[in-house]
Swiss-Prot record:
Assembly mode: Heterotrimer of A, B and C subunits.
GO MF annotations, alphabetized: asparaginyl-tRNA synthase (glutamine-hydrolyzing) activity; ATP binding; glutaminyl-tRNA synthase (glutamine-hydrolyzing) activity
Organism whose genome encodes this protein: Methylobacterium sp. (strain 4-46)
Reactions this protein catalyses: L-glutamyl-tRNA(Gln) + L-glutamine + ATP + H2O = L-glutaminyl-tRNA(Gln) + L-glutamate + ADP + phosphate + H(+); L-aspartyl-tRNA(Asn) + L-glutamine + ATP + H2O = L-asparaginyl-tRNA(Asn) + L-glutamate + ADP + phosphate + 2 H(+)
PANTHER family linked to this entry: GLUTAMYL-TRNA GLN AMIDOTRANSFERASE SUBUNIT B MITOCHONDRIAL AND PROKARYOTIC PET112-RELATED, GLUTAMYL-TRNA(GLN) AMIDOTRANSFERASE SUBUNIT B, MITOCHONDRIAL
Broadest EC class assigned to this enzyme: ligase
Keyword Transferase tagged: no
Protein name (record): Aspartyl/glutamyl-tRNA(Asn/Gln) amidotransferase subunit B
HAMAP family tied to this protein: GatB
Gene label: gatB
Length: 490
């Protein structure tokens, strides 16, 4: 169960506080080479209608054949969500007319989905963790795409996407703020990517969200909900929820009532607008598809997939904290993407985990974000970053030189140790050379020397001047020790 609603999750209205209640329906495109009921390719970016089988085009007499891999991907996802896998599920026809739906119905699952109840643990930015219930997961066909910008007076239909497998993942109405909703979608996308069941690419439409929003006074029954369709970015999800909640509050405080309807979010105008009245199940006239037998899944099939599951984000985070001594925050950052977690582990192998995490999060991620690269496009390999950390650990270079070395490797590549040798970047550990630099700084600043005993914080200034004089190559520990002795600072 979620914790009681705190004031920070309430929305201030003109006539008091309101609570927003949010449920999510995530449409995740299944990662598979072919479609749910045909052998046509699912490859993105092809010419219109290049990947359309006779089944996808609803030619008379064409019968659907279930794709075993799509079923396996749905089961893997269910297992990753700690959900009940149903041994028997049924495909139904969901009847409605739309130009990009050539059959006149969508093959979906209604009363008997492939996956039942589960849950997702969601870490919020403030450190709180909430538990979001999963109501169900079912398989269904995607529709095609209507193109309205190809001709001044005609619309065209591209059926490349028609029949592609989707998983619709329905949450319980457990979310209470836009921040919770964004964090939930982010976590769910991470789990899907770890499992390899959906790439989560929202720009390509491979992950889309329908957001159900209602408002109520704290402690009162649920209000009437509106569904915001096809929100295609996490940022827009947050904005759509905030905008829709404010719209509903304004209506209710003005004495009106909320009509249950489907709405669209316009990010350019930051508003939701009515699309159509919200359909009920009976409007779609669901009935079992007579061309498809009920789907029977054996326990051995489920168990086999369970043994193949990768280590998922929550388990990996717990292991990083226990094994490497990381903070919960650092571990959360590192496991957000599977590739990032793998990179960190390669860097940390045989080294201090905290030092590795510090370099990966602060230096590498900071630079990647600045340059707009993902971890896969990092110019600095895990082996190279590990070598830089080794050079610090064995005293060959200082932390300051290490940052300069990181920049060199980022821009030019190469072996870090060889670069240190060839460019003379080794840390000065010769006490005599360091002492000469220290003596020179002390001799040049008698006024500060006189103040140092009474003001020990001046030690930092002397250290900085000495490091500057040695080009950052002096061993910081040796510099500190010498200065403390010569300045008489305890």
């Amino acid at each position: 169960m979620n914790a009681p609603v705190t004031p920070k999750k309430l929305i201030k209205g003109a006539l008091g506080d309101w609570e927003v209640v949010i449920g999510m329906e995530i449409h995740a495109q299944v990662t598979s080479r072919s479609k749910l009921f045909s052998g046509a390719s699912t490859a993105f970016g092809a010419e219109p209608n290049a990947h359309v089988s006779l089944v996808d085009a609803a030619m008379p007499g064409m019968l659907p054949v279930i794709n075993r891999e799509c079923v396996a991907q749905a089961v893997r996802t269910g297992l990753g969500l700690k959900a009940q896998i149903n041994h028997r599920s049924v495909f139904d026809r969901k009847n409605y007319f739309y130009p990009d739906l050539p059959q006149g119905y969508q093959i979906s699952q209604y009363k008997s989905p492939i996956v039942g109840e589960g849950e997702v643990l969601v870490d919020l930015p403030d450190g709180e963790t909430i538990r979001v219930g999963i109501e169900r997961l079912h398989l269904e066909q995607d529709a095609g795409k209507s193109l309205h910008d190809q001709h001044p007076s005609l619309s065209f239909v591209d059926l490349n996407r028609s029949g592609v497998a989707l998983m619709e993942i329905v949450s319980k109405p457990d979310l209470r703020s836009s921040e919770e909703a964004k964090a939930y979608v982010t976590k769910l996308r991470t789990i899907l990517r770890y499992l390899g069941t959906c790439d989560g690419d929202m720009e390509k439409g491979n992950l889309r969200a329908d957001v159900n929003v209602s408002v109520r006074r704290p402690g009162e029954p649920f209000g009437t909900r509106c569904e915001i369709k096809n929100v295609n970015s996490i940022r827009f999800i947050g904005q759509a929820i905030e905008t829709e909640a404010r719209r509903q509050i304004a209506i209710l405080e003005d004495g009106g009532w909320i009509e249950q309807e489907t709405r669209l979010y316009d990010p350019n105008r930051n508003e939701t607008r009515s699309m159509r009245s919200k359909e009920e199940a009976h409007d779609y006239r669901y009935f079992p598809d007579p061309d498809l037998l009920p789907l029977e899944i054996e326990q051995a099939f489920i168990d086999g997939l369970r043994t193949e599951l990768p280590e998922l984000p929550d388990a990996k985070k717990a292991r990083f904290v226990a094994e490497y001594g990381l903070s919960a925050y650092d571990a959360t950052v590192l496991v957000a993407e599977r590739a990032s977690a793998d990179y960190f582990e390669a860097v940390a192998k045989g080294r201090d985990g905290k030092a590795a995490a510090n370099w990966v999060i602060n230096e590498l991620f900071g630079r990647l974000n600045k340059e707009g690269h993902g971890i896969e496009g990092s110019p600095v390999s895990a082996a190279q970053l590990g070598a830089i950390i080794d050079l610090i650990a064995d005293g060959t270079i200082s932390g300051k030189i290490a940052k300069d070395l990181f920049e060199i490797v980022w821009g030019e590549g190469g072996d870090p140790r060889a670069i240190v040798e060839s460019r003379g970047l080794k840390q000065v550990t010769d006490t005599g050379a360091i002492e000469a630099a220290v003596d020179q700084i002390i001799a040049a600043n008698p006024d500060k020397v006189a103040q140092a005993k009474a003001k020990p914080t001046l030690l930092g200034w002397f250290v900085g001047q000495t490091m500057k004089a040695t080009g950052g190559k002096a061993n910081p520990a040796a510099v500190n020790a010498l200065l403390k002795t010569k300045l008489g600072i305890e």
